[in-house]
A protein has these predicted regions:
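Histidine-acidic metal/acid-base catalytic patches
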Residues: 2-34, 43-57, 179-285
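Active-site acidic/histidine proton-transfer and metal-coordination neighborhood
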Residues: 10-21, 25-27, 49-51, 87-94, ...
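Hydrophobic faces of well-ordered beta-strands that scaffold small-molecule active sites
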Residues: 33-38, 62-64, 95-100, 133-135, ...
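Active-site-proximal loop/turn and secondary-structure-junction residues that shape catalytic pockets
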Residues: 41, 66-68, 101-104, 137-141, ...
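Conserved long hydrophobic alpha-helices within structured protein cores
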Residues: 55-64, 130
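Glycine-rich, proline-tolerant flexible connector loops at the mouths of alpha/beta enzymes
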Residues: 65-84, 140-144
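A generic structural signal for short coil/turn motifs at secondary-structure boundaries
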Residues: 71-74, 107-108, 144, 232-235, ...
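Charged helix-capping and loop-helix junction motifs
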Residues: 77-83, 111-119, 146-157, 209-215, ...
Length: 285
């Protein structure tokens, strides 16, 4: 997720039903990896129809949004959780993760409302049966060169970490920070329930050596991974996907790989994601 991706959260409305046939293969890539997509990349954030779309693409799951600009409660409501689980079951697609992208607009580092969001997200994740919660730190929530905001986030994460530990849930920090900067936060919080949500494209945009960073953080500090491109299909942009695979192999990472962005200008989303899915499966199978 980045600043541009964050804008997609403001949509929050229903997407017209699609009637395309299923093109992809939904079989899990292997025992190590499951391939999903962010709901805001394949439709409006929070749209329950994302599971049917994911099925058409051939994905294993969807990373769903906790809330949207038009509904700050959304999945904090038990009825919405029930409907989301039913939609996933009907599509034969998993709920692959939870994300709080609204933190980009209403920042965790300064707005007291977000403390309840993050606390409640632990309960929501447990109810949905997911392990990892993405906490977005871009736009208004950017921590880069903000020691005061970073310290507030550390204190808030310390407060929620025991609850996450007890629930068996992990809070993942996705930001513009480097691996050493992330590690400083993780060490300050001091909880196995707070890790890094690693986005290979964002870190490439920042000029970091993503392959070294992946190895530095290791599987114990990376909770989940975004495979993303901006304006290109996955595998055709700036990120060297085979080298990402090698780095993940080297640290023994296993889990979800969620696709994000990766829709070239003028190319339909569905067509793009069918191709993105095939590309990732061909390498990670």
């Amino acid at each position: 997720m980045n600043r541009r991706d964050a804008l997609r959260y403001s949509l929050g409305a229903g997407l017209s039903a699609l009637t395309y046939p299923t093109f992809g293969q939904t079989k899990v890539a292997n025992n190590r990896f499951r391939i999903g997509a962010c709901d805001w990349s394949i439709g409006p954030a929070g749209d329950i129809k994302s599971f049917a779309i994911a099925k058409q693409i051939g994905l294993d799951g969807v990373q769903v949004s906790l809330n949207t600009a038009s509904d700050h409660e959304h999945l904090r409501k038990p009825e919405l959780q029930r409907l989301m689980k039913e939609a996933a079951q009907q599509a034969g697609v998993q709920i692959g993760g939870l994300a709080i992208g609204m933190l980009n607009q209403i920042p965790y580092k300064s707005d007291p409302r977000t403390e309840a969001w993050v606390q409640d997200s632990v309960d929501v994740a447990k109810a949905l049966g997911v392990k990892n919660i993405l906490l977005a730190f871009f736009s208004n929530n950017d921590l880069k060169n903000d020691p005061k905001g970073t310290q507030i986030v550390i204190e808030r994460l310390k407060a929620v970490a025991p609850k996450a530990e007890k629930a068996g849930v992990v809070l993942g920090i996705e930001s513009w920070l480097s691996a050493p900067e992330h590690l400083a936060i993780l060490d300050a919080v001091g909880s196995p329930a707070v890790k890094v949500y690693y986005d290979v494209c964002n870190s490439s945009d920042m000029g970091y050596d993503i392959f070294s960073e992946i190895r530095t953080l290791g599987k114990d500090r990376i909770c989940e991974v975004h495979l993303k491109e901006n304006g290109y299909l996955i595998g055709q942009g700036k990120v060297n996907l085979p080298k990402v695979k090698q780095a993940l192999d080297d640290i023994g990472y296993a889990g979800w790989l969620h696709l994000e962005g990766a829709v070239p200008k003028g190319k339909p989303m569905l067509e793009s994601y069918i191709e993105n899915n095939r590309t990732v499966r061909s390498l990670f199978a």
